[in-house]
Amino acid sequence: MPIPRKELPNVGEYVIATVKEIFDYGAYVTLDEYNGLEAYLPWSEVASRWVRNIRDVIRENQKIVVKVIRVNRRRKTVDVSLKKVPENEKRRKMLWWKRYLKASKIVELVAEKIGKSIEDAYREVVWKLEDYYGDPLLGLEEAVIRGPDALREAGIPEEWIEPLYNEALRHVKVKMVKIRGLMFLRSYESDGVERIKKILLSAKEILDKVGDNVKGRIYLLGSPRYVIEIIAPDYKEAEKVLKEILTTTEKLAKELKVEFRFERERK
């Protein structure tokens, strides 16, 4: 179980809980993010609609998302609500927790390999990635895409960088998107081939300047058709690069009196 950053949650916080015991008047749950801290879920906070049996809504050992509604810091007691958690928040929190656990396990594995304690793993890596990226796994994904500098930016100590980066490459798979299109270039001038080469070179220079998280290539499909292919972490980034390429090449084509046309690949 991950090490908690603080002893008790704050009122209004959404937390992951495991249903421990169910009674006629409510249930006791343990908070996964707080080292199994016990919290009380009153009957009145189980569901917004009337239910005959609390077990129609929850069951023992079930993972649920609850909202903290009361905290007694002196007695270290916590009350939570299930009915005050919106559906979208349930999905968001569950996904975040799943990703947090995966990132934590990767960092703990690296800690064991380099002789660091579990406490060091969280203090020096997991929490720093969380603070910088909002999600430790997102930090590892950025490292896979952009390289070790993504870890350095978050303030990770240098002794962690190489082993953590290598472990991320083994365990973190980043989904990439690809967009393609056909660029038609035709010139009737005597030096038309050279003019087209200049246009293609201008496009290649743009691809060479984009960050490590974007890959692209331009190749001849059969004169006068050239394929433009952009691979990026998301469509927004891919479209941004494609737009820059098309704006630059179309402008240059007009200057060089080269016929220009672009067609998006149909899916």
Curated annotation (Swiss-Prot):
State the oligomer form and interacting partners. Heterotrimer composed of an alpha, a beta and a gamma chain.
Q: Which Gene3D superfamilies match?
A: EIF_2_alpha, Nucleic acid-binding proteins, Translation initiation factor 2, subunit 1, domain 2
Q: InterPro entries under this entry?
A: NA-bd_OB-fold (IPR012340), S1_domain (IPR003029), S1_IF2_alpha (IPR044126), TIF2_asu_arc (IPR022964), TIF2_asu_C (IPR024055), TIF2_asu_middle_sf (IPR024054), TIF_2_asu (IPR011488)
CDD domains associated with the record: S1_IF2_alpha (cd04452)
Q: What protein name applies here?
A: Translation initiation factor 2 subunit alpha
Q: What does this protein do?
A: eIF-2 functions in the early steps of protein synthesis by forming a ternary complex with GTP and initiator tRNA.
| One protein family per Pfam | S1
Per the similarity annotation, which family is this? Belongs to the eIF-2-alpha family.
Query: What PANTHER family does the record point to?
Result: EUKARYOTIC TRANSLATION INITIATION FACTOR 2 SUBUNIT 1 (PTHR10602:SF0)
S1 motif domain boundaries: 12-83
